[in-house]
Amino acid sequence: MTCVGIDIEQFVRDPYGSGIQRVLQQLALQWPVDGPGADFVVPLDDAFGLLTPEQAAGLLSLAFVPRDPGADLRHIVRDHLVALDPTRVRAGDLLSIYDAWLLPEVSYLPSVLERFELFAKCMPTAMIGYDVLPMSDPANYRFKPGTAAWVSEYFRHLATADAVVCISDYARDGILGRLRRDPALPISVAHPGGDHIEVQEGRPPARPLFTRLGTMEARKRPLEILAAFLEARRTQGLEADLLFIGAPSASDEEINEPARRASASDPAVRWVQGASDDEVRELVGRSSAFLSIGTEGYGIPVLEAVRLGTPVLFDGIQPAGDLMSGHGARRIDGLGHHGLVSAFEAYGEA
């Protein structure tokens, strides 16, 4: 029987509950019992641990469950991995175990990319394609010194892997266009779903609440959202609240500081970090509107908000928003400052 090795070292090294890591979690949870065999492969001490899909699902889900404030998720993941006591093999044995190799997460780790290069010489390789934004919009990304060459190496593999499955048409078009992937090589689109959340009725509060979910990244326009909200309150008398849910930018403190300052000084602005799945669902489900503005490779939170019964207001490159337009999501004039101010005013009175 065919057996696939799935490399999840990136998750173990940097677990942070992103949309990409949600895809990994669902990949493990939904791996077909009648499909090819699969091991989720992780470095473990001086060997590699081989996790079953069930074991991997439990490990990957740790990024989305409640934990004590200040707890180091990397340590939690490491302790859980050791407790699983998975089958261990030497690095040299991996090549003889697998018939194909899958890299399911964006990774600029030299160890991950060098391993992919080695396996590509011996067997079919596949990747999940999320976007090419670091190549098409480099101004939005600040990589640590010495990382640039590995960023390029990751995208080189995305252009040459034997097969790529993309999360959206936008991702596929970027890989074919920007990366110039040979269109004769297999490349397909499989949209992530939102059915990990049960359909619910929305529970909006009496005072309008606008919620934005995701890491503070320039491409998602958190500062533009904040500036428009504050102006709508100041000039239009908007009586509403704004909630940010998500981690701070790891590379751009200039994005974090204004949001941190506003949440500390203005009771109408809140910023919740480190929220679990249950906490996110409660907060989004009790919002008046969910904001998704800017550029997304796909936008799983849009699907989650729709299933929680919370109307979605979106603008920009939003594949999931476009899919759900007219079905719980609405495109607004949200890329310009004045349009976003007007949207806050209009929907704050609804």
What is each residue range found by the language model?
Residues M1-A350:
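Carbohydrate transferase catalytic cores enriched for Leloir-type hexosyltransferases
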